[in-house]
Amino acid sequence: MGKYQNILVAIDPNQDDQPALRRAVYLVQRNGGTIKAFLAIYDLSYDMTTLLSPDERTAMRKGVISQRSAWISEQCRFYIDSGIPIDIKVVWHNRPYEAIIQEVLKAKHDLLLKMAHQHDRLESIIFTPTDWHLLRKCPCPVWMVKDQPWPEEGTALVAVNLSSEDPLHDPLNLRLVKETLELAEHVNQTPVHLISAYPVTPINIAIELPDFDPSVYNDAIRGQHLVAMKALRQQFGIDEKFTHVEKGLPEEVIPDLAEHLNAGVVVLGTLGRTGLSAAFIGNTTEHVIDNLKCDLLAIKPEGFTCPIEGNEDQEDAE
């Protein structure tokens, strides 16, 4: 039995084609498990009208939920008839990301899949406010699915942070690699690559310190990263040819290598902080995500505290 046995798929209400559902079925066919197709809907006009009694408004909401449930059933019919176990749940909620996270917590889902919309001309993925809320706050891994089939001979690229002094990063690196290898083992033996980017010498240092040698600095930084990468790959028996230590900004290096390797998915860690430090899902991670042209799997560290309460009953669920 593989990892990710209890999958939640966030249904896109605006189109019949559901890439996230397709990807979930692809995983279940190779990895086992079950799927729940989930949709949170809301229409302010149903709550604004004063011409309807509370009972009538409730009945109208339930009618809309019933219609949407039937629509999702039609999208799932082929998969269900093929033997894929899919449950369907539609709820009335004015904040989709909260409804999704509450469902993750309530039903203990271990993976969330959601479609990511693609910019037509740039090929990069466009993330909505709901997407960002989920990436920051959802306690289980979040797989953002591009509207493309898995590439032929596609790889998985794991972005690890080997330069941070943040104590959360070392165990998070281990978790990223471990979970990706476990998943890849069950999904067509997908090759797993590791990538770490290291910074170039700040120009102002060379100007302010005449005796400073940028080449010595760069060699030292690269050496530190190579040693750390070797230690990481050896823990998992990964061949050196599958590891990459590249000079430059992560938001440039990681998407470029993903494209070069024909990556089907980039796996990275999100610390999911809130408040002021939310600027660092962290700043670097958000820039990387914005530049990707493939699927994204974002994983939180162990012990992550979800800021959303999970014990609310979903209103008017079906």
Curated annotation (Swiss-Prot):
Protein name stated in the entry: Universal stress protein E
Record-stated family: Belongs to the universal stress protein A family.
PANTHER family in alphabetical order: UNIVERSAL STRESS PROTEIN E
Gene name tied to this protein: uspE
UniProt keyword terms in alphabetical order: Cytoplasm
InterPro entries per the UniProt record, alphabetical: UspA (IPR006016)
Role summary: Required for resistance to DNA-damaging agents.
Coiled coil segments of this chain: none
A GO cellular-component term linked to this record: cytoplasm
Compartments in which it is found: Cytoplasm
A Pfam cross-reference name: Usp
